């Protein structure tokens, strides 16, 4: 199917939706909201297609002028220049439409759960968990997104074994989904007297927040344990048993939350994280199956799970997936990460274009 055929189908779908929205007999709010959502999803495509049709018409008219034996040379020359400009305009619109027509990641618009954990490197890894957490906090402060801390496990040296937080707002998953993976840090620890550079790593998981309709958790499938909250070094930070640990028996997934003073709030947050982890597990299995099928067709393109290196002595950050290096790590750690996240999103689109090209 050519791109024009695809655009014609989208335009027909759009016209059908508009007709239904103008139908006074449709009064169900859920139906109306669903139609409005579908309309907004393809509105930009239809508008760009209208522009394309205008340009194609102008190209046709200019070609007729050039091919007309009665047209004088000066007008033909002007028409040829006009055709050149119009063809460039057409190419720009078509390229934009190819991107708009790409299949959307169904999770892009969802809120997310982010988990940052220690990897290799002991105390240095725990300190870097804190650095990454501050980096994402500052990044989110620069956007219209909102963050809520779900659970933290601080260490005595000021780092974290684990930080879990949620991010809500427009396209939260699309904005941060490329942060999942192993983040490697190279720097001289404060305790290192010899000035040697140490390498450690922390891991980041970005999961779409699952709705109750996405993942159903049965009461008989979970075990809930209540215990007293603890801080760095294991000392008690709460006089009541308000911390909650939930074990999902079918998968063996375990989530705990102790940041709230209320047991009920901790349980609700823990369930939200558990639901996201189950959803992510199911999505990963589905994607692995699709990737396996695709590899059988086009060969393997696996990459290392290490996605990024942060080199503090050189003030350098390198993203290994796109081979981009920036020498402004200080600003990157202050939340200025969009240069790389935008490049990753662009690469995803380019890869999809290559896969879905006509």
From Swiss-Prot:
Keyword hit for Transcription regulation: no
Pfam families reported in the protein's UniProt record: PCRF (PF03462), RF-1 (PF00472)
PTM note: Methylated by PrmC. Methylation increases the termination efficiency of RF1.
Parts of the chain that traverse the membrane: none
PROSITE patterns: RF_PROK_I
Molecular function in Gene Ontology: translation release factor activity, codon specific
Source species, domain of life: Bacteria
Location within or outside the cell: Cytoplasm
Modification N5-methylglutamine occurs at: 235
UniProt keywords, alphabetically: Cytoplasm, Methylation, Protein biosynthesis
GO annotations of cellular component type: cytoplasm
Function: Peptide chain release factor 1 directs the termination of translation in response to the peptide chain termination codons UAG and UAA.
Family (UniProt): Belongs to the prokaryotic/mitochondrial release factor family.
Name this polypeptide is given: Peptide chain release factor 1
Organism: Brachyspira hyodysenteriae (strain ATCC 49526 / WA1)
Encoding gene per record: prfA
């Amino acid at each position: 199917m050519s791109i024009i055929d695809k655009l014609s189908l989208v335009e027909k779908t759009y016209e059908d939706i508009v007709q239904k929205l103008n139908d006074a007999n449709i009064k169900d709010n859920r139906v109306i909201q669903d139609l409005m959502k579908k309309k907004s999803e393809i509105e930009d495509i239809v508008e760009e297609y209208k522009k394309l049709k205008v340009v194609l018409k102008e190209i046709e008219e200019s070609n007729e002028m050039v091919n007309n034996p009665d047209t004088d040379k000066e007008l033909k020359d002007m028409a040829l220049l006009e055709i050149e400009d119009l063809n460039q305009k057409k190419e720009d619109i078509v390229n934009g439409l190819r991107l708009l027509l790409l299949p959307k990641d169904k999770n892009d618009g969802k809120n997310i759960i982010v988990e940052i954990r220690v990897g290799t490197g002991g105390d240095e890894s725990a300190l870097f968990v804190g650095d990454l957490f501050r980096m994402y906090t500052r990044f989110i402060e620069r956007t219209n997104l909102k963050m809520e801390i779900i659970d933290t496990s601080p260490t005595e040296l000021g780092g974290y074994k684990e930080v879990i937080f949620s991010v809500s707002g427009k396209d939260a998953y699309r904005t941060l989904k490329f942060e999942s993976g192993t983040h490697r840090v190279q720097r001289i620890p404060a305790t290192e007297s010899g000035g040697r550079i140490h390498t450690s790593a922390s891991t980041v998981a970005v999961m779409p927040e699952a709705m109750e309709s996405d993942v159903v958790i049965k009461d008989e499938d979970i075990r809930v344990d209540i215990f007293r909250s603890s801080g760095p070094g294991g000392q008690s930070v709460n006089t009541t048993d308000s911390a909650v640990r939930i074990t999902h028996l079918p998968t063996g997934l375990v989530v705990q939350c102790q940041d709230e003073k209320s047991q009920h709030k901790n349980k609700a947050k823990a369930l939200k994280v558990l639901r996201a982890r189950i959803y992510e597990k199911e999505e990963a299995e589905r994607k692995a199956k699709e990737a396996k099928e695709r590899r059988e067709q086009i060969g393997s393109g696996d990459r290392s799970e290490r996605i990024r290196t942060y080199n503090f002595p050189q003030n350098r950050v390198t993203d290994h997936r796109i081979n981009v290096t920036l020498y402004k790590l200080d600003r990157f750690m202050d939340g200025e990460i969009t240069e790389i996240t935008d490049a990753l999103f662009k690469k995803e689109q380019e890869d999809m274009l290559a896969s879905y090209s006509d």
